[in-house]
Amino acid sequence: MRPRGNTQEDYLLRIIRQAAELLRQLRRRLLGGEASAESIRQDAAVAIDFLLGSQGPVLGMLDAISAARLVGHPAIVELWCALLDVEAEAAEASGDPTFALRCRARALALRNAARMLWGETNPLAEGEPSSE
């Protein structure tokens, strides 16, 4: 009989894989020009909601350190940042540089917070699904 894995860890890995795939699709669409920047921006926001789950609204209001600590997993924080980067690129392309700047600033703050909490490691390069 196969030993059962940690259910919470399995769930996190599944969410990480699915969000990484959404990120790949969004990047492809953004680079390919096959969809409007506004639809990519909206889909990036939906992907962030999926990744963060019911805590998303609260996490969006917290400072970066508190948000990263509450997320609790460096790969999820990095995916969140990567999705914010896509959202920023799409906002820039759709003529909203102010929103793009806010997204980029939040991604930078979250990355810095993750470094403070977990060090310099790249969680997506160490056995987690790649977002590229």
Residue ranges of model-derived segments:
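Hydrophobic/aromatic side-chain positions at a characteristic register within alpha-helices
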Residues: 4, 11, 30, 85, ...
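Long amphipathic alpha-helical segments
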Residues: 61-65, 117-129
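Structural register within alpha-helical repeat arrays
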Residues: 18-19, 25-26, 80-83, 87-90, ...
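The tetratricopeptide repeat
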Residues: 14, 21, 76-79, 83, ...
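TPR/TPR-like (Sel1-like) alpha-helical repeat modules
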Residues: 41-45, 97, 101-119
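Short acidic, glycine/proline-enriched loop segments that cap or flank alpha-helices
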Residues: 71-76, 91-101
